[in-house]
Amino acid sequence: IEVLVEVDVGAHRCGVLPGAPALELAGAIAGEPGLRFAGLHAYHGAAQHLRRPAERRAAIARAAELASETKSLIERAGIDCGTVTGAGTGTFALERDSGVYNELQPGSYVFMDADYGRNERDADETRFEQSLFVWTTVMSTPAPDRAIVDAGLKAFAVDSGMPLFSDAPGLELTKASDEHGVVRVAAGSAGPKLGDRLKLVPGHCDPTVNLYDWIVAVRNDQVEALWPVAARGALT
């Protein structure tokens, strides 16, 4: 069985410390007859949503440095370190260009979300379009400055903030309960009408997808496919 050693290169989540602790674990794996040390997992998740490009560059430069030093240490001990894997949607070009990583792991680029949309970007950075939306219907208009929609906490994740409305200027989703969302209508803006269908951009695409059994694939206002979310709830 091929095994990667996860190294903490700045995310402070899982992973052994770079350097000697990673070497010790790699050596233990290499010494087991049923295992083969395959390389390092050096993913810096926290860097993906650093807002300024300079912050992301600095974080990944340090991550790449730690990964490179650890790889060299392991190889000097006579253990092959064939893979260094990491990177995400917010930084993949930096890992790609580092000369250290030979496998990249971006995933959110397929859908994007409101939180990634808050990242500042350099002019030459790759930009991915938003493709994941949650449709919701206006179910009540109790006041000129307020509307209620039928999407709430059961329809989208809020760990990275409330969803944003797509193509609906002047509307802001300010609060969500299980099956209701409270919409604030900006002064001078035309409020939505009862029964209007509105399109939401989720704050965080990953846990939002996990709430659904199916993704409805639409092109030019026509449904082209239904994609099952096969891994929904597969948490063990």
Feature names for model-found ranges:
Residues 1, 33, 77, 82, ...:
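Structural beta-strand/beta-sheet cores of well-ordered domains, especially the beta-sheet scaffolds
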Residues 141-236:
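C-terminal accessory subdomain/extension
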Residues 2-4, 8-122:
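Active-site loop/helix belt of alpha/beta enzymes
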Residues 22, 56, 60-67, 127, ...:
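Generic structural signal for well-ordered, non-membrane alpha-helical segments
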Residues 56-58, 91-169:
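Active-site loop ensemble at the mouth of alpha/beta enzyme cores that anchors a bound cofactor
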Residues 30-33, 76-78, 96-97, 130-131, ...:
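Solvent-exposed alpha-helices and their adjacent loops that cap or buttress functional pockets
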Residues 12, 138, 223:
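Glycine-rich, flexible loop/turn motifs
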